[in-house]
């Protein structure tokens, strides 16, 4: 028994050493600058009778993206935003963001204290590819504490599915998986409390989805489970 315990102790030390020396697997997927197969568009409410005005341009000097918008002052709903389509032509091009733990924005914000981000994912239990609203929306209100260029990190865990989606799409609320393996679109839009008639702008230098794989940790835990089983 003592010999077995010594062997298990040595194996435990070896397991910890291997875990410590194993390289971490970093994951990074760029949203901007654009990758092949991605399509970026700016939108506003003019096609639906509104008078909001969105503008999108690029800056040659630093390869940044400049988006600006002014919401109309009428009584009807107003909106504007940016939309990245990751797979405009094929389900095969959805981004697999299972390893993503945060979205990182390098952006210069002017004229607003909040903007919304919305990640649309393909839910095999719900989504009809012909109905863009049937994709699962994961949203987050991003608070901007100051104007100017800044690095904003949004943990993916803070994105949530709004109640109105379950109601409008008649989806069972027990279906809670985010389905990050099928990231289809990313959207940035004006905040809920954006003032009408006031212009705001986002100068985007980069957007990336980042994460670290827990594969090595999983192997270590499995290794210790095997040792515990042998010891018992």
Name each region found by the language model.
Residues 1-232:
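Beta-rich carbohydrate-recognition modules and glycan-binding surfaces
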């Amino acid at each position: 028994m003592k010999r077995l315990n010594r062997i298990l102790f040595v194996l435990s030390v070896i397991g910890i050493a291997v875990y410590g020396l194993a390289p971490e697997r970093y994951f990074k997927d760029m949203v901007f600058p654009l990758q092949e197969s991605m399509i970026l568009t700016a939108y506003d409410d003019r096609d639906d009778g509104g008078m909001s005005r969105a503008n999108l341009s690029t800056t040659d000097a630093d390869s940044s993206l400049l988006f600006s918008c002014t919401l109309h002052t009428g009584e009807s709903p107003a909106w504007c935003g940016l939309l990245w389509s990751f797979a405009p032509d094929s389900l095969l091009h959805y981004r697999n963001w299972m390893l993503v733990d945060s979205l990182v924005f390098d952006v210069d914000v002017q004229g607003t204290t909040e903007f919304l981000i919305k990640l649309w994912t393909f839910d095999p239990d719900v989504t009809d590819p012909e109905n863009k609203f049937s994709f699962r929306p994961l949203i987050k209100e991003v608070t901007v504490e100051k104007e100017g260029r800044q690095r904003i990190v949004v943990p993916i865990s803070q994105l949530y599915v709004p109640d109105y989606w379950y109601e409008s799409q008649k989806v069972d609320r027990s279906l809670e998986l985010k389905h990050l393996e099928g990231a289809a679109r990313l959207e940035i839009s004006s905040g809920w409390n954006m003032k009408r008639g006031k212009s705001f702008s986002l100068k985007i230098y980069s957007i990336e989805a980042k994460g670290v794989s827990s594969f090595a940790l999983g192997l270590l835990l499995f290794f210790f489970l095997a040792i515990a089983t042998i010891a018992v």
